[in-house]
């Protein structure tokens, strides 16, 4: 096929003129000359394909050129089919061939005919001589070459060698006198180079697609397949053709020849130090060195990438490889979440430098690669100045607490220091910076702590078992929705589904917040360990009315809720949920973090009181310079049960206000956050409040130290029964008052405070979670402490707690004589009475079961149409749809 016959095929279907480089290709892949397209737009004011009538939305100038057409035209110009006048390179080649009569006489007619037909000549050991030679790629021998092993081509100086193909940059395969063989490049002078090869690439790995419907645009191939490159799609993908299929494929899976390399670099901006003709790969590196030994040369000739012609295959430095760096891939069809995590964009880890995780007797150590930040969340980049080991802090080793641990809270520890020492004698870790710097550098804590909200049974060896309420430290989130982390109870590392857990950590909202490290440990059985800072500090408070001056005191330990959990490398609290609680209590306490709105602070006082018991072991809380005083110190009593209570800590550096006259209350873990409003409102525990044995709790959650030992022992037995879950006896209900308001009145000294909860106060916002709903009100109840009224946050309780029999709202309107000296004013919290008109079955633990005719005291009406209130029938507080009730 000559040039004219080929060009006749490259004509515009509209005007039948020959196409040139200005031709445009439409989205339907039909190509027309630019002049015809402009004429169509000018006459019809729109552009439709003349062949398929497809409407084109873009202008003619915006349409792309046909790259294959451009390359074909360039190839025709660079390689004329007929000898050009004036003695070009082809003419010189022909004259040189004619001057060598012996060489001309020995050329192969079969090779010449196949070359004239545009076909690749067949390699054979011997060809009969012919008379004429067209313009074939050829070279002139500069030196004699005898060949050193079978397969080498022998020639003499001055011989004209017909070039068949280029093995690599140092070797050619050619023909002299009808004999084919290999010869070195530096022994010849190229007279006419080989034609430019088509843009092709060789597959280095298998590329498979799992979902053929979703990935129908992908072009699957096997290793060593040769693909024709069409164009570059984006930074990491190219379009190509294999057999009769066209699709896209990842650039890093293939090795390009020089023509394909130029095509790939067509739209990419030039980078200094990178040659567009270079192609770097592991396969090419084996054939770039000069021939130094027979073994090396033979290996190069037999195993080179012979199907492609490489113009320049010198190895590039790794920094110049950009996105086309070839690395061992992970198959897209892989279902292993750990394998999929390698190509995850969320992981932030390079395949060549994954994080190393070691488990030893010293605990969990995660070492990030030096050049890649470890990421575990939406912004999941660890600061460079803090190592990953520091982020794990006191989790070395993350084992269950040993028996007989003394849990202390040292409020006098400098803010920002990490003092969550384990019972094995681990001392406080030194602080790496001030609290302000920590809050500034780490707006979100690392690593992420998650709590299991559903149980999960592992199906593979690398999966972790999830138990409801168990805590996990997540240090990698895979793209397929799986998490990689470690159980904070068993210390095992593995993967688990991300939708089975809920995050615990939250962003630090107060940069100047002072953190007081606290460690509260259990004694026996299995504990759930989590890392959290507590907030305390500020001026010491004094009690007004009983003349008690502020001084350090010792109060029983408190099991704090999991609703306020943070993991900061500089300020942590190692908190253990002890085995003295029932399993449901511990899980409910941890489960609160799943749905707890952590930006809405609340406070809590548990509703069950216990008397001074000789069998309760103390977990001391030292509040140096920050605690409230008490008229007498709390006795330290040995025993096997850890007495726990819920305490509230002010976010704005308010002190822990707990009386030390007697142990505090309740084995039940409330769902309150460990923070109050930023204005410094706290829940103050007042000493010296006498209570009756039937009393469920006092307004401030402390117990009297003046009861006889008989009552104390009786109360102790009841507490142990509650802790073990053996007690199912319900306390008598208190009938609701005539008035729906929640108000604490001052009365005679003989009447104790009754009811499950003291004054109801509005928290910072709506708050809903499984198993507990706080009671909101419209007006605050203030308590005068140290001459100033401290506004309290709302008390709330879990509907599933052991004290659920005691109604919490509305409490009976009876006087509390013990509050007389300290309460200067009390304001009612307004509630609205509603009647249930349609029964409503609850859909979750946070919702109330409504029966037709029930009376509900509504505390808050939300914007979404849901109400929060207390059911008069059983005293439970929760959410329910407002359309099921009517106001009375």
Curated annotation (Swiss-Prot):
Catalyzed reactions: S-ubiquitinyl-[E2 ubiquitin-conjugating enzyme]-L-cysteine + [acceptor protein]-L-lysine = [E2 ubiquitin-conjugating enzyme]-L-cysteine + N(6)-ubiquitinyl-[acceptor protein]-L-lysine
ZnF bounds (RING-type): 12-53
Phosphoserine sites (modified residues): 304, 532, 735
A Pfam cross-reference name: zf-C3HC4_2
Residues covered by region (Interaction with RAC1): 292-362
Metal-binding listed as a keyword: yes
Zinc in keyword set: yes
Biased composition (Basic and acidic residues): 707-718
GO biological process: negative regulation of apoptotic process; negative regulation of extrinsic apoptotic signaling pathway; neuron migration; positive regulation of JNK cascade; positive regulation of proteasomal ubiquitin-dependent protein catabolic process; protein autoubiquitination; protein ubiquitination; regulation of CD4-positive, alpha-beta T cell differentiation
Region spans: Disordered: 108-128, 275-321, 516-548, 620-639, 684-741
InterPro entries noted in UniProt: Endophilin_SH3RF, SH3-like_dom_sf, SH3_domain, SH3RF1/SH3RF3_SH3_4, SH3RF1_SH3_2, Znf_RING, Znf_RING/FYVE/PHD, Znf_RING_CS
Record annotation: effect of changing residue 28 to A: Significant reduction in autoubiquitination
Composition bias type Polar residues, residue spans: 108-127, 305-321, 520-535, 692-704
GO molecular function: MAP-kinase scaffold activity; ubiquitin protein ligase activity; zinc ion binding
Subcellular location: Cytoplasm, Perinuclear region; Cell projection, Lamellipodium; Golgi apparatus, trans-Golgi network
Chain ranges of the SH3 domain: 134-193, 196-259, 445-506, 829-888
PANTHER family for the chain: CAP, ISOFORM AC, SH3 DOMAIN-CONTAINING
Described function: Has E3 ubiquitin-protein ligase activity. In the absence of an external substrate, it can catalyze self-ubiquitination. Stimulates ubiquitination of potassium channel KCNJ1, enhancing it's dynamin-dependent and clathrin-independent endocytosis. Acts as a scaffold protein that coordinates with MAPK8IP1/JIP1 in organizing different components of the JNK pathway, including RAC1 or RAC2, MAP3K11/MLK3 or MAP3K7/TAK1, MAP2K7/MKK7, MAPK8/JNK1 and/or MAPK9/JNK2 into a functional multiprotein complex to ensure the effective activation of the JNK signaling pathway. (Microbial infection) Plays an essential role in the targeting of HIV-1 Gag to the plasma membrane, this function is dependent on it's RING domain, and hence it's E3 ligase activity.
Protein name, entry field: E3 ubiquitin-protein ligase SH3RF1
The species this protein was found in: Homo sapiens
Gene: SH3RF1
